[in-house]
Amino acid sequence: MGAKEKLEAMLNVALRVPSIMLLDVLYRWDVSSFFKQIQRSSLNNNPLFQYKYLALNMHYVGYILSVVLLTLPRQHLAKLYLYFVAALLLYAGHQISRDYVRSELESGYEGPMHIEPLSMNRFITALVGQLVVCTLCSCVMKTKQIWLFSAHMLPLLARLCLVPIETIVVINKFAMIFTGLEVLYFLASNLLVPFNLAKSAYRELAQVVEVYGLLALGMSLWNQLVVPVLFMVFWLVLFALQIYTYFSTRDQPTSRERLLFLFLTSIAECCSTPYSLLGLVFTVSFVALGVLTLCKFYLQGYRAFMNDPAMNRGMTEGVTLLILAVQTGLIELQVVHRAFLLSIILFIVVASILQSMLEIADPIVLALGASRDKSLWKHFRAVSLCLFLLVFPSYMAYMICQFFHMDFWLLIIISSSILTSLQVLGTLFIYVLFMIEEFRKEPVENMDDVIYYVNGTYRLLEFLVALCVVAYGVSETVFGEWTVMGSMIIFIHSYYNVWLRAQLGWKSFLLRRDAVNKIKSLPVATKEQLEQHNDICSICYQDMNSAVITPCSHFFHPGCLKKWLYVQETCPLCHCQLKSLSQQATGESGSSTNPVSEQSATNPPLGPVSRAEVTTEPLAAVPTRSALEQEPTMDIKVSGSVEKRIGELEAHFSQGEANLNSNEVLQRLQAKGEANPEDLNVKALPPECEHCAEI
């Protein structure tokens, strides 16, 4: 984005902020109390204020005008502001002319001005002011006809011509009328412009809705108006005005405790309307986004933005603040109560930001510990951030206990802080284990189990903390004041933080226990079998000093296969089902009733092989890597008719003749005259290769 585009984007936001401020003022304005004040004042006899319903309608018209100003295109909005500036300049010219005429009437001097220094000074000052006004008006309206804005210079010309003072007053009134007529002519000539704009806007909106739908229209308006940035700038302006008003009326210095109270009360003052509350929501979202971006930049530098340029974070914290503010009726409270409730909500938002920071730091820290990167600066940044995430949540929980009376909401904040510290402890412990393994010459035995036990320990502690929170909430609901909102929070907290965590932990425990049982049920390869196999582990691609043999006669490291079985219950190579001893016994009892089981054991079927149909062959028949490298290659050429007939025969074999091997299939095809030796150019295979191909 170039400098011009950035300037246009800034103007697009800055020109729309007054419309949001006008909406906020109209929401604060109480029309009924306003008319009661007028009835007590001297303005009650003014005919303008005697039509209450007309003023009420003007109040709603103000809302409509604010929305129109908010949704106008940027070019038309800039023109409107320029016209408004021109009107202000004309009013300034009128004020200069009126003040000059009044000063001349008070002096009573009607002679030549060069004789009277004071009269000359008044004339020069008024003349310079009128020239500046005319020049600025011509620049704003982009016209060279400067005489259109010089009507207020007529009293000055009359005074230069020694016209009597009474006549100058009449000339000044004529200049005012002439300027007013010019303004009315301009308004009349542009009277249909709003109608034409509304007509064209309606036509464009109808086309967009017809082609893309309402959702696309809403997203387009959201992006064009830059709603988050617009409300954030609006709220920051309100907050700055509030701080300026406080310090401009205070002469004494403010203490640190007073500054904290001032900060909270200023935020509370800027949350009294729905528009200012939305501004605070978007401001918190951008602050959270900035903190998380700085966190990732601190850990990874500029590489953090190469893989994650969008950084769509921060909205969770803003939505959390909005939901809590709406549910608790934040904008309807008094300022002091609003500041107290807002402090609790901000604590919840800070706890959510800390949890998001941990979600960013955890994979980066663990990846840094597992890698061989020896940069001390990278490790220092990772460890220092983890230490901050360990200490700050604990300090925040301590401060909450010191300044607030304990209730269910505060207990949720404290539990969230404690859980964050526990997660950081687990991350640091695993990082230390990775670093110890890095400095050792040999890998640590059962490192995966150690990491699992560490994760399981702090997951169990998280579960216990969540369970304590639920127990406290239930006791407070039963013996204290019962509310629907509190019951909903307890139910949601119980489901997500207790039930789902318990279910996930139990499922992980069962998977690991089943994987351990499967590994124990597999035979361990001897040294002669490993030498005869002469291969590497297909999972880690390392030489095998120890291995287990699967039912499908594949060799793997016990630790590698156990990690694989944590994810899925199949062989990594052929994807046969690997079952435990109890499941194998069940499968064998079911397969004993099969009349063709013995034949299937000797001659495996063509096609997919299940685990119940696979038998452990003698290791001499299992093909090794050296044996396969010495075998000749196969050159198979099958015609279309033969391929079709093979499919039919396979379907026939699956119904009761599954004991036929590939050689018998070819013999049957040749006996029926449906296959010639030229069509099937298959070299003879050794028994072990044929067995491998069938599996």
From Swiss-Prot:
Polar residues bias (residue ranges): 585-603
Region annotated Disordered, chain positions: 585-610
Keyword Metal-binding attached: yes
Keyword Zinc-finger recorded: yes
Stretches annotated zinc finger (RING-type): 537-575
Location of this chain's protein in the cell: Membrane
Transmembrane segment boundaries: 53-73, 77-97, 123-143, 146-166, 168-188, 225-245, 275-295, 316-336, 340-360, 384-404, 410-430, 460-480, 482-502
Molecular function per GO: zinc ion binding
Cystine bridges: none
Bilayer topology annotation: Multi-pass membrane protein
Top-level taxon of origin: Eukaryota
SUPFAM superfamilies: RING/U-box
GO-annotated cellular components: membrane
Keywords: Membrane, Metal-binding, Transmembrane, Transmembrane helix, Zinc, Zinc-finger
UniProt name for this protein: RING finger protein 145
Gene it is expressed from: rnf145
